Structures are given as structure tokens and as C-alpha cells.
């Protein structure tokens, strides 16, 4: 049976990549595509919007009218929109892949609560390479973390609205958890003026916003006389889109639960 996928935010940069990824993947098909209420893109063919030709799927701004056309919703939009989509999916038993970042604690609690009813993959980054990096960071932190300074440096395009990136925060969380630290108290997100000497147990974050950078992350484990850097650079959003579709296919036989790309890629068994 073919898995029917809907895309939220179909007209955005990521939305168009997701349409392309669904169209090219085996075992899935594009069932619906959505934009915000009143968008000028409503009624446009999703395939033409994504530059791959006519698909016969018109962009809609009404999930209710399209609910019989999809089994799973992929959402890379904004937290407020995603939370509305979550409520709809819970009410209509639709699975979700969520790549939206910037949720506050209440938003994360809402996602966890929804996963009691439906199956959700929620990840800060759907790149296979980035999720492998998460595991490498845990290994490095275990060996070097208590003896070095740790800094997370990330760069994204000028249009990104949240900082640090969700991926950078996830990197920090993986490191902090490995070291038994709380990122809320050990994370340093701003340095300005006379800050005093750096504390050894800090996990620092630096953010760059410039031009059309798709996404770059680097973590330094810096000791006296040597430094280990673990980096990932994305050159195309298709890596995230393909990962999201892979996650959706993995969810097909799951009734409920909250998962991430570690589960999808079975990284805990490495």
C-alpha cells in the first residue's frame, strides 16, 4: 500500500524540496500540499510550484477538506503553525514528521502529549550525516569532554529566524547528557564585554547568519596543544528532505510514540 504524504508550508524553500523528495521516492506519493490561510499560492499545482511539472495536487489552506487524501503530514514550518497541525493530526489519526525548530518548553510538551495518540518523528535535523555526528559527539565527549573547552559554532542563511539553530542545541544536548551536565545551566549563548575567564564546564555557542548558507555546524573539543573538530556542512536542503521522507516511511507501521532520527537510523546499535 502506498503511503500518502502531505506537505505543510509547501511554498517555502523547504516545502518545495519536500515535494521533490516525495515525488522521487519509492513507496510514497504526494497526497496533499498546504499553505497558510489566504496564501496567494492556494490553488497552484504543487509539482509546478516545486519545479517538477504538473502533479495534479493543488495547494490548499484547509486541512479538513483534504484529510482523506493523506496518511502522514511532514511539517517544517513555524512553531505556532505546527502546533495547530498537531491538534488536527491527533483528531484525525494522522502520523507526523516534524522538522520545525524553535519550540518553547510548552510546545515540546504538546508534541510529547500528542505522541500518546499518534506516531511522530520529531528531530532538529533530518540529515543522515548530522545524526551520525550526534553519535560521534557523544564518543568525543566521553573521551575528552572533562579535560577540554567545548564550543559549538553554527552558520545558516540570513532568513533563519531562530538562534542558535535547533541542530546546534541538539549537539549541545548530546554533549551535556554524556557529561552529566544540564545545558540550561552550562550553556553560554552570548559573550560581550568583560566576561571573565572561561569556565571549563561551559558549553559555548556561536551563531552566524549570512547569505544563502544552507547549514554548517562545527564542534570544537579544545585542549592545550590540540583541538578535535567535528563538522558537518550541508550543500542542499535535499539532504533534509530525503531524510524526512525516509522517516515518514519508517513511521508507516507505527501506531503511536515519539521518535527521532536515532530511532529511524538505528544509531543506538552502532
From Swiss-Prot:
Enzyme Commission number(s): 1.17.1.8
Alphabetically ordered keywords of this record: Amino-acid biosynthesis, Cytoplasm, Diaminopimelate biosynthesis, Lysine biosynthesis, NAD, NADP, Oxidoreductase
Disulphide bridges: none
Recorded catalytic activity of this chain's protein: (S)-2,3,4,5-tetrahydrodipicolinate + NAD(+) + H2O = (2S,4S)-4-hydroxy-2,3,4,5-tetrahydrodipicolinate + NADH + H(+); (S)-2,3,4,5-tetrahydrodipicolinate + NADP(+) + H2O = (2S,4S)-4-hydroxy-2,3,4,5-tetrahydrodipicolinate + NADPH + H(+)
TM helices/strands, residue ranges: none
Subcellular location: Cytoplasm
SUPFAM superfamilies: Glyceraldehyde-3-phosphate dehydrogenase-like, C-terminal domain (SSF55347), NAD(P)-binding Rossmann-fold domains (SSF51735)
Cellular component GO terms held in the UniProt record: cytosol
Swiss-Prot/TrEMBL GO biological process terms: diaminopimelate biosynthetic process; lysine biosynthetic process via diaminopimelate
Enzyme class: oxidoreductase
Positions of NAD(+) binding: 9-14, 35, 99-101, 123-126
Binding-site residues for NADP(+), renumbered to this chain: 36
Pathway: Amino-acid biosynthesis; L-lysine biosynthesis via DAP pathway; (S)-tetrahydrodipicolinate from L-aspartate: step 4/4
InterPro entries xrefs: DapB_C (IPR022663), DapB_N (IPR000846), DapB_N_CS (IPR022664), DHDPR_bac (IPR023940), NAD(P)-bd_dom_sf (IPR036291)
List of catalytic residues: 156 (proton donor/acceptor), 160 (proton donor)
Residue numbers binding (S)-2,3,4,5-tetrahydrodipicolinate: 157, 166-167
MF terms (GO), sorted A to Z: 4-hydroxy-tetrahydrodipicolinate reductase; NAD binding; NADP binding; oxidoreductase activity, acting on CH or CH2 groups, NAD or NADP as acceptor
Pfam families assigned to the protein according to its UniProt record, in alphabetical order: DapB_C (PF05173), DapB_N (PF01113)
Recorded family membership: Belongs to the DapB family.
Function: Catalyzes the conversion of 4-hydroxy-tetrahydrodipicolinate (HTPA) to tetrahydrodipicolinate.
Family matches, as PANTHER family: 4-HYDROXY-TETRAHYDRODIPICOLINATE REDUCTASE 1, CHLOROPLASTIC-RELATED, DIHYDRODIPICOLINATE REDUCTASE
Protein name: 4-hydroxy-tetrahydrodipicolinate reductase
